Amino acid sequence: MKIAIVRLSALGDIIVSASFVACLKELFPQARIDWFVDERFAGILEHSSVIDNLCVLPLKRYLKSWNLIGLVRCVLKFRAETYDYVIDMQGLLKSALLGKLLKSRYFCGFDNDSARECLAGYLYEHGTKIAYEDSIMERNARVLFDALPVDENFQKFFWRAVSARGEMFGYTQEHANSVNALLFDGKKHVLFILEASLASKTYSAENFIALGRALAGDGAGEHGAQGTKRGGREDIAVLLLCYQDTQKAEEIYEELKGILPVKILPKMDLNLIKALMARMDLAIGGDTGITHLAWAMQRPSIALYGNTPLARFQLKGAKNFALSGNPNASYDKNDHSINAIAPEEIAKRAREIL
């Protein structure tokens, strides 16, 4: 059986979709799985034991430069392969067009009422019907379940997929060694994920500082690194992950450096971030891909939501918690209610995990 997965972007969506694909090797041991992805996000799927062939496309780059001929040539080279199933897990017109160009026995995706872009739904031979507003976990599981000859009921498949999700994400020993050199000896590492695609999805520097103080038991700041008067832990170290907002990272570092071990991480590619996440005892951040990666790699996490609805985006796991600052979130880019989540509430959850 030859299966092609089309999920081109974005990072968080790829991570969640990939988590549900991991179980397919268990269900279909002889299956070959190819994955079509934009080059910007290919690193998150590299070194996977589940993916047989990673088909990397310069989609964004070619579209930005209007190099449509180059893009078509790039896609057509994959037509030498014939797949049993091509599954578009994205539901956009661009992903549906790509899937349509591939040779397959069955081309599957979301129907026109369920796809993010309804026109995409008309291109599939089989379309899964599930409300776009439904849980992203259920949507990803359902489109795979409906497309493939799975010999078990949906609930069993769903939980099989959730249990197997960590098998998808791999990295090299070189990546692991690079990460190990950044860690503190004898500490439990808490990763603060400082950025997201939108400012409204990021927890503020002020709140991260208060959270660090709460974890150290130094809510008022007068107890120093050894303070434990408010339930702090001396075995905790904080790592700060940022990509562009170095000023935010430096502000948090300066406020926490006298209270507990803290370090600003160097810029990392996606392979290094996978190796980093594998060593984290807890990851805390907004509704963004790296926070989702903690769930996907079965690492403890606390995901913070504000302008996106918790019921739709929450990723559930044994040690994966979610908190929301707005029970009526409606995707408003000016909604910064993520910062209504009290740092002490997050710290309380963190203590339960650690």
List PLM regions with ranges.
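Catalytic machinery of carbohydrate-active enzymes
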Residues: 1-354
